[in-house]
Amino acid sequence: LTPAQQYGLGLRAGLALRQLHALPAFADAKPWEARFNAKMDAKIRAYRDCPIRFRGGERLVEYIQDHRTLLRGRPQGFQHGDYHCGNMTLTQDLRLGVVDFNRMDSGDPWEEFNRIVWCAAASPAFAAGRVDGYFDGPVPEAFFPLLLLYIASNQLSSIVWAIPFGEGEVQTMLRQAEQLNAAYEGFTRTVPLWYEQGRRLAGCEGGTGN
């Protein structure tokens, strides 16, 4: 597939996610700010107790501590729970499908982008299309700083999660940590390089958004 085709599939994946998020949160969903702050606290403790560290880990902890206020007032809706290209299907005529709903939950819709790093590793154009397709217009200014908060939280727990599955999974997560560090240039920026690269490869003009 050409980068433009990959971007087009990303647009469809973003639209599908937006449609999922139009569904209401579960009635028993607890307040998001308190719930996710508790989750981040647990992940920071687990990372610091883990014998395996990765480059940039403490920068992620600092970013989390400095940006907790971004959670304030965030809405909640239905979540797929594991939305990335590994849980999508593609037919020969390029029809996109979404599978693996066994982790469905309620939460901030934008948290669903926390696994977009898998998409970016496979295709920057697809990942950029996912973002643009979700918003169908200019990307809100608040999105990328909050995206980094959610990605940082997810990455911190990745090594701890991988250890029981063996050395191969640990190495995969360490490589992902390196890719993350590169995408954010040592966490000195909030818009990841893959977003700009993906749009450029797909022939999109301008900076962020359509």
What does each model-found stretch correspond to?
Residues 1-55, 74-76, 105-106:
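A cross-family kinase active-site recognition segment
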Residues 7, 11, 72, 115-210:
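Helix-rich C-terminal or lid/interface subdomains of diverse kinases
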Residues 13, 17-20, 40, 83, ...:
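Generic structural signal for small/hydrophobic residues in well-ordered secondary structure
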Residues 1, 92, 102, 110, ...:
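Short, flexible helix/strand-to-coil boundary loops that buttress conserved ligand/catalytic motifs
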Residues 64-113, 207-210:
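Active-site acidic catalytic loop and adjacent metal/ATP-binding pocket
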Residues 60-62:
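Short proline/glycine- and basic residue-enriched helix-capping loop/turn segments at helix->loop/beta transitions
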Residues 22-26, 69, 76, 139, ...:
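Generic structural signal for secondary-structure transition and capping sites
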